[in-house]
Amino acid sequence: MVLLPEKPVWMSQQQYEEQYGSLLKLKESEKCNHEDKQLALQPKESSIGYSTQERIAKLSVPEVQDDDKNSKVRNRKHQRFDLEEKKKKLRLQKTIEEQIKHHDIEMTANRVVNVDHVVRQHYNERTFLSKKHNRNYSPIIKLRNFNNAIKYILIDKFTRAGDVVLELACGKGGDLRKYGAAGISQFIGIDISNASITEALKRYHSMKNLEYQVILITGDCFGESLGVAVESFPECRFPCDIVSCQFALHYAFETEEKARRMLLNVVKSLKIGGYFFGTIPDSEFIRYKMNKIPESVEKPSWGNSIYKVTFSNNEYQKNGNEFPSPFGQMYTFWLEDAIDNVPEYVIPFESFRSLADEYGMELELQKGFNEFFVEEIPNWVNRFSPKMREGLKRSDGRYGVEGVEKEPAAYFYTTFAFRKVRDYQE
């Protein structure tokens, strides 16, 4: 029997037919064969006997009542059967989707396809799912609050009133209000997920008192020149004062070519004296975890009940606890209610700093989330709204994260900021 996944709501019919065209044809052929068999097995009508109405008319009253009771019992059985069938169908659907995703990840790990396809599909799907859930009931709500606090502080630290901001991989526009508080004059957001950009536009139109221009564009920030994406938007005021990238830069380190294209996009978009800042996985924390895993483990992994990191091979351990290359060191990252086993890439920070220097940028800041938060929170606690302060409060009355959320929030990520000091000559 041909198993065919249902079309996701965010996928167009054309994309669905392109991806599963061969399966659709097999399914149609199977359906026709099944209908032919059913037709052949169907009993022919007998000319002898009574019609349904005539049979009911001949029944006595007690027989009709018994038939009603039996009918209700049968209906209940059918309802239970239908419910079980629905559950089976959902389980089967989930299994098929997981198999397809596993296949896509394997293809990415073997470099048959690049990571863009998997990333775009994941964030299109997450955008749809997020509409159905109230984030206030998220199991990682404290982690989200902590990450937002880090971004608020970073934005305030490097952004000035009147600045023009370019955000790479802007997602659903979650930082629009943060930039509003900084008093910027223009925000240019670019993201590879068209569903995320659509949601960002809705968010922007629903906001009040945002006194700056917002331009949202679907485009590839890492794989191609930004000129391709922004050429239809002459209102963009390049060069910018700020380029920001939050929790997404790791996708650029799939290859050296991508990492260099990303940095070229940054320096071409940025004024001399402007800042490039963001948040990335902390390569030193990843090394610390990997160093504790023996070479005998083929697929090193670690995590807890809300997050998990899994490498596709143990080349790091075989190479004397060093990554064989600064690029293409893939792992899958799962975070409860946020990231569903999406391929990501290690950003060895010294390699990142060296490349940035080559492109005319000097390092201004690099601190892990925990260190950065501990240093900055005394100056910020009274600047946050009461709701934000409450969202950051731990069970001991202090501010930050605790329990299972602490590792993926406070230790897995680091902040960075570079300042452009000279133009890059290609």
Curated annotation (Swiss-Prot):
PROSITE patterns: RNA_CAP0_MT
Annotated SUPFAM superfamilies: S-adenosyl-L-methionine-dependent methyltransferases
Keywords: Methyltransferase, mRNA capping, mRNA processing, Nucleus, RNA-binding, S-adenosyl-L-methionine, Transferase
Binding, S-adenosyl-L-methionine: K151, A169, D191, D220, Q246, Y251
Segments forming domain mRNA cap 0 methyltransferase: 138-421
Main subcellular location of this protein, as a coarse class: nucleus
EC number(s) recorded for this UniProt protein: 2.1.1.56
Domain of life the protein comes from: Eukaryota
Keyword Repressor (UniProt): no
Locations listed in the record: Nucleus
GO cellular component: nucleus
Annotated site, mRNA cap binding, chain positions: K172, K178, R203, H250, E344, Y413
Reactions catalysed, as given in the entry: a 5'-end (5'-triphosphoguanosine)-ribonucleoside in mRNA + S-adenosyl-L-methionine = a 5'-end (N(7)-methyl 5'-triphosphoguanosine)-ribonucleoside in mRNA + S-adenosyl-L-homocysteine
Family annotation (InterPro entries): mRNA_G-N7_MeTrfase_dom, mRNA_G-N7_MeTrfase_euk, RG7MT1, SAM-dependent_MTases_sf
Membership in a protein family: Belongs to the class I-like SAM-binding methyltransferase superfamily. mRNA cap 0 methyltransferase family.
PANTHER family given in the database record: MRNA CAP GUANINE-N7 METHYLTRANSFERASE, MRNA GUANINE-7- METHYLTRANSFERASE
Protein name, UniProt field: mRNA cap guanine-N(7) methyltransferase
Gene name of the record: ABD1
